[in-house]
Amino acid sequence: MIRRPPRSTPLYSSAASDVYKRQGHGASYYWIGKAPSAQFFTALPFGLNAQEMNAWLHYGGGLELWEEAYDKFNLIPLAGGNTGVQMAGWFNKEINSLEDIKGTRMRIPGLAGKVWTEAGGEAVLMPGSEIFTNLQTGVIDAAEWIGPYNDQTFGLHQAAKYYYYPGWHEPGPTLEVIINKEAFASLPSDLQEIVRTASRAVNQDMLDEYTARNNQALETLVNTHGVILKRLPDDVLKKFKEITSKLLKELIAEDSLSKRIFESQENFKKNVSEYHKISEKAVYEMRELN
């Protein structure tokens, strides 16, 4: 079951497609109730990382599919930020096996929330502003937010002491800029291009900032605040991956656009992963040599 805790408020009270609204900024997976395919444009569990996501959107046909998905809502989507690989979350208990997932109430949205529920936990939906209080008071047992840079600012280390990785649920989460189509069309072509270019610049700048700041924040969390950094067990990650595959098969069987998007993303991931084995991965391994 996925539920809202008491006193929670809707994440969005109105859509940018309202003729009186001009644009918005958020994450597409909050819209999966209206558009199941929206999940693909934030992040998929075990999916593309930030570098791959940007490449797929801008050079692999992803942006065109995103535009198609939002067309019926009278919206133009643009990538407007990426925080890089996220942390798996904050927990008030250790996760040593699948048994520890059972009954654990966790703030985790999107497809990952459904995975968590199928694994025996309970996914809870709430805006970021409510995470600290609900985690501190025991309304929830765990929460994912973003990563060390943001999580430290939110004070989440004061509400739970176990900090888990890897971020299986959001390996490369993209934020979106959504623009009313009529409002965008009213701009001259040069200003339209400025908007697109500015959004793309912000998208990359956010990733640069998080890459620079996350480790500094993590060192403070661990060395100053005594946070206990832990890795999720392999059997837990394997189960999450198995459930993710099952849920995606169900989704693409019900929604033809989701099927096309998924196939595009999977083919792109397969191709770039082959090269990454001898490039990105090889460099990481090389740097570990003594």
Label each region the model flagged.
Residues 1-16, 20:
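Single conserved hydrophobic/aromatic residue that forms the stacking wall/gate
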Residues 14-53, 61-63, 68-290:
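N-terminal secretory/targeting leader peptides
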